[in-house]
Amino acid sequence: SAAYRTTRSSLRSLATEGLELISGRDCAALDIGCSDGTLLSFYPRWVDRFGVDPLDDVDQIGDWAWSAKAPFPSADLDRAFAGKKFDLITAASVLEEVNEPRAFFARAKSLLTEDGVFALETLYSPMILTRTAANVFAGGVASVYSISVLERILRDCELKIFRGSLTEKDGGSICLFITHAESSDYDFDP
């Protein structure tokens, strides 16, 4: 993921925005689909960095971050984390490859601290379809979502979206910041 400037910029933005939401404390961050650790490298040293990815790129991550070559979720990761909680979880360009999104979100929720943030960037179907981005579908993605479908899946998993934005990544993506449904820490009250 470090090979392209636009990808690095997008990952830096996701890491920075997520960290700003929980700033002012020591924290632990998990990057799902971390590839070569590019997103993790944008965190300051005081962040405990963890990355998981089923591909060989994860082997490039040095001792500066804990990493595992494993799919998410998996029994191996459950054993490795053994009750660990994360203040910030990120997943960029991962949801498109997930066959069971409810299991994915449920496991992420179980790893999130009470006031934690889950930053998700994924392809956004209205933008992909209106731009006729056929290369997205030719690439073999498992799914592409609209905001209403994502909201429904997240609601089923007792999570909620509290901030979002559209991005140009991969022809049209959406960046969402998610937390526990019962949390009011990030509610906007004018």
Q: Where is each model-derived feature located?
A:
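Conserved S-adenosyl-L-methionine
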Residues: 159-170
